[in-house]
Structures are given as C-alpha cells and as structure tokens.
Amino acid sequence: MQTIEQQITNVIEESLIDMGFELVLVKFKGVNSKVVEILIDSLNSEKVSVEDCTKVSRTIPAILDVENLIEDASSLEVASSGLERPLVKFENYNRFLGREVKITLKELLNDKTSYQGKIIKAENK
C-alpha cells in the first residue's frame, strides 16, 4: 500500500513536469502533520523563483482536491529544493555527479549512518 506522500507524488508529478518543474519531495510537517510541503526544482537548471513557487501553489490544490487526498491538511507549502536538496530518485545521483554530498543511511554501515563525499559514479543495482 502506498503512503499518502507517494499518492500525492503520483497525482501531481506529471502536472509539475508539464509546468517545467521536477517534484523533489512531498512531506508532511507541523503539529499533527497538517502542513503539506512540496519541494520543487527547475527542469531547465534555472533557479526556482518565488513566482514559480506561487504558480505551483495555485495549481496543485485543485489537483489534490479532485483526488481528495489531503482534506485534513490545513496548508500547502511549495518551496525550492535549494542548495541542500535531498537526492530522492536514482536519476538525481547521475545529475549531481562530481558534487559533494552528505548521505544519511537508515541503517548502520561500518558503525555509522552519516557519510560525506563526492559522487563519482551512480549504479542502480
């Protein structure tokens, strides 16, 4: 079964691509998870502007209302993924080859969960 974040991703991702944006992450935050935060990035490598976030924030609620996914949410926040954007999809690792990254693992690897280094290769095994 998909999480609500995955369901929202499935519903809005194509619309964001049509608008020229990549959906980076959907997450709930705030007290009782009443705030839906959507992080976006530009598909054409330009910086995401405040106007871009406003445009997306006016489009997404209509899509979510039709699908009836976040009826209990009190607000929707759209923001640029920024300089410290999370690398969520495999394609992100190839896009950022050669860049310095901080990685946080869910499980211990060699007695650590945090690593820092440069992405030199990305393989999907």
From Swiss-Prot:
Subcellular location: Cytoplasm
SUPFAM superfamilies in alphabetical order: YhbC-like, C-terminal domain (SSF74942), YhbC-like, N-terminal domain (SSF75420)
GO BP terms, alphabetized: ribosomal small subunit assembly; translation
Disulphide bridges, residue numbers: none
GO CC list: cytosol
The entry's keywords: Cytoplasm, Ribosome biogenesis
Family membership: Belongs to the RimP family.
Function: Required for maturation of 30S ribosomal subunits.
Protein's name in the database: Ribosome maturation factor RimP
Organism from which the protein derives: Rickettsia canadensis (strain McKiel)
Species classification: Bacteria, Pseudomonadati, Pseudomonadota, Alphaproteobacteria, Rickettsiales
Gene designation per UniProt: rimP
